[in-house]
């Protein structure tokens, strides 16, 4: 098999597909190579949360952040493996990536003011606000292409339904304590399949 492309992306997880979308939006011919028979990479197994300090939605959810605090946190977490140049590049590019996808694609994100850093009490850590997740969508919109996607880990599902966004998770956790949540969960379960 021979083909020409401007950009060859290795892997179909979030990073690979994000690179492919960005390159295509820039007018380049893109090919994605995936070693597995299904798309999604390890992102499909992880639940899909992204750790993005200073993302554009932090103001909306009432969270203040700074590049300095995020870098301090990463220095504390990484120790000897801390690479200031890479950390700076990540902290500058990650919020722009969120803006790009929100503006240029159908991908939208939800932020959580209560989803903490792994070690929120560490220097520069936050009790919430840095993590975002792609907003849930109805997989049936993909038709037969849905079968091309790697299924999430069973531990991340309820009756085979991926509980993706923070808002959905809250409803599933509160189904027995809130009529609104019970109704939401019932609709989700009845609409599945």
What function would you assign to each model-found segment?
Residues 35-193:
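Conserved N-terminal/central alpha/beta ligand/cofactor-binding core
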């Amino acid at each position: 098999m021979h083909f020409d492309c401007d950009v060859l992306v290795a892997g179909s997880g979030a990073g690979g597909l994000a690179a492919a979308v960005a390159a295509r939006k820039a007018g380049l011919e893109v090919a994605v190579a995936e070693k597995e028979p299904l798309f999604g990479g390890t992102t499909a197994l992880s639940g899909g949360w992204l750790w993005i300090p200073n993302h554009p939605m932090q103001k909306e959810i009432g969270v203040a952040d700074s590049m300095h605090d995020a870098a301090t946190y990463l220095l504390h977490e990484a120790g000897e493996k801390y690479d200031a140049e890479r950390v700076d590049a990540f902290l500058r590019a990650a919020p722009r990536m969120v803006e790009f996808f929100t503006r240029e694609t159908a991908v939208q994100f939800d932020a959580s003011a209560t989803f903490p850093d792994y070690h929120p009490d560490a220097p520069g850590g936050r009790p919430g606000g840095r993590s975002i997740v792609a907003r849930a969508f109805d997989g049936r919109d993909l038709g037969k292409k849905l079968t091309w996607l790697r299924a999430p880990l069973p531990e991340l599902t309820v009756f085979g339904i991926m509980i993706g966004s923070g808002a959905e998770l809250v409803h599933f956790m509160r189904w027995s304590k809130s009529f609104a949540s019970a109704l939401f969960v019932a609709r989700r379960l009845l609409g599945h399949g």
